[in-house]
Amino acid sequence: MKRTAHHRLLMILTVFSLFFGAGNLIFPPFLAAQAGQNTWPAMAGFCLTAVGFPVLGVMAVTRAGDLHRLAARVHPAFAAVFPLLIYLAIGPGLAIPRTASTSFEMVAQAALEGSTRLPLWQLAYSLVFFAVAGLIALKPDALTQRLGKILCPLLLALIGALFVGCLLAPHPYGAAAEAYQTHPVIQGFLDGYQTMDAIAALVFGSVIALNLRALGLTEAHAIRTEAALDGVGAGVLLGVVYLCLAHIGGVSGGAWPGAKNGAQVLSQLAGSVYGRCGMALLAAIFVVACLNTCVGLLSSCASYFHQRLPKVSYPAWVALFALISVGISNVGLNQILALSVPVLNLLYPIVLVLILLAYLPKTETLPLLYPIAGWGTLAASAALLAAKAGVLPAALTDGLQVLPLYAQGLGWLCPCLVFLALGAGLSLLKQRA
C-alpha cells in the first residue's frame, strides 16, 4: 500500500507524541535559562543527543524487528533479562507513574494552591488520568488516530500559544552560567544525553511498527523504510519544538534568574504573560504531554509482556500496569525512583551500544562483536555505577575516576570503544583462522 502525505504526517505526529513527555518539556527551557547568551550553541549540542539518539534508536529497533531480537545478538540470556529490565524500569518502575505525578504538580499549582486535601485530589487525578490513558492504550494499532489526529495537534497548539506570548513580551537573555561559558556545545551534548530518550526509542519501536502495519504496510523492508522516515520527521519536529522552548527559557531566565528547574522557568513566564490563565495553559500542556507519553508506555509495556506471557491478555496487562502506576504515583514514587534511576543509568550505555551495533555488519560477519561489546559495556557500566555508589575499594574507584569523561557520566565510553575494537578484531582473526 502506498502511503499518502497525510498518513506520513499522522505517523510523524504520533511518534513525536510518544517521545514528548514532561521531561522533554522542561529540559530545553532550563538549559536556556542556564546558558543565557550561549543558548544556541548549547542547544545545538543538546539536539545532537536528545534528537539524534531517539531517531537512531527507532531505526535500529525496526531494523532488528524488536528489542528482544536486537538484544539476542549479544546472547540468549542477555535477551531474556535486558529487555525485561528496560520495560520495567522505564514503564511501571519510573516513567508511567511519573507522568501522573508530574502533571498533577502543575495542575495543583494552577488550580489547587493552598488546598489541604492535596493527597485526596492527587488520588482522584491519578485514577482519572490512568483510566483515560488505559482506554486509549487498549488499541495500540490505533494510536495514530488518537495521538496523531487529536492529542499531538492539541499539544502543539498549546505550546504555540505559550511561544507567541513569549514573543509578545521580549526580554534579553541573561549571562551564561559557569558550565555553559567555555564549552556550551559540549555541555548541551551532555544535557541531551541525560534525557535518556534512546531507551524510549527501543521501547516505542515495536508500537511504531504495529501502527505502520495498521496503515496497510506488510513488507518488512517497507516498514523499516517508513519507520526511518517517520523517525526523522518526528526528530525534526522535536528539534523545532525544543528551539521554541529554549527561546522561552532564555527570555524567562533573563527576566527572572535563579529558577531551580524547567517547570519553574516556564511557570514564571506563563504567569507573567497570561496571569492565572497562563498557569492553566501550562498545566494543560503538561497534562497532554504526559498523557501522550503514558499511553505510549502503557501500550509498549503491555505489548511486550503479552508477547512473553500470552496467556495474560493485552488489556489485562494494560489494566495491571495502570493500577500499579496509580499506587506508585501516590505513595511510593520516590522509593521506586531510587531503584529505577540506577537501573536506567546501568542500562543506558548498553542501549547506546546496541543502537550503534545495529548499523554495523550482522553477527555472521563479526560473530564476536555483539557478545564482547555487549557484555563488556555492561561490566564497565556496572563498575562505574558501583564506584559512584561507594561500594568498591578505594583503589579501584580511584582507578575508574581517571577515565576520560568520568565526571560527566560518560566514563563508560572509552572502555566501550575498546570492547568494540576487541570484538571486531577477534572476529576477523577467527575468520582468517
List PLM regions with ranges.
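Hydrophobic, membrane-embedded alpha-helices of multi-pass small-molecule transporters
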Residues: 10-20, 165-172, 181-245, 278-290, ...
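C-terminal membrane-solvent junction of multi-pass transporters and transport-like membrane proteins
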Residues: 352-421, 432-433
